[in-house]
């Protein structure tokens, strides 16, 4: 009986180590995506907006070179990962069927250390994301296209 419990405990412990990532881990990547790229109701979309939001989101130590904020509903952004608002795009990416209001903040000046100065570009664009388990987890800056 003791040997049977030991084997059962061993199998249980091994099973814990071999299980796939939990939904909570998946949601943390989505949460990180939102923290870095989502701002539903921006207060202005100029250089001051960029400097303020980049600082508030912790993207200024060191100064991040470029970051894009998406202004739209979470539902429409998540829908890119489905056929509702997204199509396959290149390897493991999806492109939105509709355009989104975005603000891209680009570092202006030579130093990567604060104080960081940003230039804002406000636009409407289709966006390209990487998805995991039906949630956006990465915004692909390099293949944006203007409409």
UniProtKB/Swiss-Prot annotation:
Subcellular location(s) of the protein: Secreted; Nucleus; Nucleus, Nucleolus; Cytoplasm, Stress granule
Coiled-coil regions listed: none
InterPro entries: RNaseA, RNaseA-like_dom_sf, RNaseA_AS, RNaseA_domain
Enzyme class, spelled out: hydrolase
Record's keyword terms, sorted: Angiogenesis, Cytoplasm, Developmental protein, Differentiation, Disulfide bond, DNA-binding, Endonuclease, Hydrolase, Nuclease, Nucleus, Protein synthesis inhibitor, Pyrrolidone carboxylic acid, Secreted, Signal, Stress response
Disulfide topology: 50-105, 63-116, 81-131
UniProt signal peptide: 1-24
Entry EC number(s): 3.1.27.-
Pfam families reported in the protein's UniProt record: RnaseA
Gene Ontology biological process terms from the UniProt entry: actin filament polymerization; angiogenesis; antibacterial humoral response; antimicrobial humoral immune response mediated by antimicrobial peptide; defense response to Gram-positive bacterium; hematopoietic stem cell proliferation; innate immune response; negative regulation of apoptotic process
Location of the active site: 37, 138
Any GO CC annotation of this UniProt entry: cytoplasm
Modified residue annotations for Pyrrolidone carboxylic acid: 25
GO function term, MF aspect, one: heparin binding
PROSITE patterns in the record: RNASE_PANCREATIC (PS00127)
Binding site for tRNA: 45-46, 105, 127
Motif Nucleolar localization signal per UniProt: ranges: 55-59
Major place of residence: secreted
Activity regulation (UniProt): Has weak tRNA ribonuclease activity by itself due to partial autoinhibition by its C-terminus, which folds into a short alpha-helix that partially occludes the substrate-binding site. In absence of stress, the ribonuclease activity is inhibited by RNH1 in the cytoplasm. In response to stress, dissociates from RNH1 in the cytoplasm and associates with cytoplasmic ribosomes with vacant A-sites: ribosomes directly activate the tRNA ribonuclease activity of ANG by refolding the C-terminal alpha-helix. In response to stress, the angiogenic activity of ANG is inhibited by RNH1 in the nucleus.
Role according to the record: Secreted ribonuclease that can either promote or restrict cell proliferation of target cells, depending on the context. Endocytosed in target cells via its receptor PLXNB2 and translocates to the cytoplasm or nucleus. Under stress conditions, localizes to the cytoplasm and promotes the assembly of stress granules (SGs): specifically cleaves a subset of tRNAs within anticodon loops to produce tRNA-derived stress-induced fragments (tiRNAs), resulting in translation repression and inhibition of cell proliferation. tiRNas also prevent formation of apoptosome, thereby promoting cell survival.
Subunit-structure text: Homodimer. Interacts with RNH1; inhibiting ANG ribonuclease activity. Interacts with PCNA.
Family: Belongs to the pancreatic ribonuclease family.
Identification of the protein by name: Angiogenin
Organism: Pongo pygmaeus
Upper taxonomic lineage: Eukaryota, Metazoa, Chordata, Craniata, Vertebrata
């Amino acid at each position: 009986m003791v040997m049977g419990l030991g084997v059962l405990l061993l199998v249980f412990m091994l099973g814990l180590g071999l299980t796939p990532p939990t939904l909570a881990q998946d949601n943390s990547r989505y949460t990180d995506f939102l923290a870095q790229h989502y701002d539903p109701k921006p207060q202005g979309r100029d250089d001051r907006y960029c400097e303020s939001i980049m600082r508030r989101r912790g993207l200024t130590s060191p100064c991040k070179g470029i970051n894009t904020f998406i202004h739209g509903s979470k539902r429409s952004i998540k829908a890119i990962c489905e056929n509702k608002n997204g199509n396959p795009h290149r390897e493991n990416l999806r492109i939105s069927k509709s355009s989104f209001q975005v603000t891209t903040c680009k570092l202006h000046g030579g130093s990567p250390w604060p104080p960081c100065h940003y230039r804002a570009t406000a636009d409407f664009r289709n966006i390209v994301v990487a998805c995991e388990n039906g949630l956006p987890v990465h915004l692909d800056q390099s293949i944006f296209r203007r409409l």
